[in-house]
């Protein structure tokens, strides 16, 4: 009638998780929410260690998907990161679903992106890359619209002939296309 042993089982928190979450916030992610099927006590402890803004414990798969839908209806873009079968409905409902490579096959199939389980820093890398890609697209768009508007104005005023305008237009399109092919700078990955 004596206690022989106590066994505690815990999924260890990835050591880079707090740094990845901090980096995502620096990159413009305004709210990081953790949803888990774990108990309140476990969820609170993990949430405190990794630095999420909100956490929900004892959550069922359909609750995760409902939360994603609610956030989308509120006008937010939702990125869902998950690795299990229970994450699949929410991964499917999110604007962007990210699966972890060693997770359930269905999660990987449903997700838009799969990142390596060995390097969660890839999530921040992807966000940084996408931010810089959008900046490049917007810069190229403004440049080409401004340049072509100038060509139209010069053509309407009779300052340049149509053949010169066509040549300059095609040259600018080629230069913008070449600029689009240049590497997009991103900061070093988190390891």
Predicted regions and their residues:
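Cytosolic catalytic headpiece
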Residues: 1-86, 92-96, 128-131, 189-191
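Membrane-embedded alpha-helical bundles of multi-pass transporters
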Residues: 26-29, 50, 86-87, 92-96, ...
């Amino acid at each position: 009638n004596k206690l022989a042993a106590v066994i505690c089982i815990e999924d260890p928190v990835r050591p880079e998780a707090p740094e990845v979450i901090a980096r995502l916030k620096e990159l413009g992610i305004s709210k990081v929410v953790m949803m888990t099927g774990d108990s309140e006590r476990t969820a609170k402890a993990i949430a405190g260690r990794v630095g999420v803004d909100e956490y929900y414990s004892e959550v069922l798969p359909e609750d995760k998907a409902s939360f994603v839908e609610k956030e989308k209806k509120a006008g937010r873009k939702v990125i869902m990161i998950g690795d299990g079968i229970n994450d699949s409905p929410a991964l499917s409902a999110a604007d962007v679903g990210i699966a972890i490579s060693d997770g359930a096959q269905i999660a990987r199939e449903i997700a838009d992106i799969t990142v390596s389980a060995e390097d969660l820093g890839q999530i921040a890398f992807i966000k940084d890359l996408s931010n810089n890609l959008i900046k490049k697209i917007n810069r190229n768009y403004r440049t080409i619209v401004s340049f072509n508007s100038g060509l139209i104005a010069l053509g309407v005023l009779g300052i340049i002939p149509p053949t010169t305008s066509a040549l300059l237009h095609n040259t600018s399109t080629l230069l913008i296309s070449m600029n689009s092919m240049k590497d997009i700078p991103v900061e070093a990955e988190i390891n």
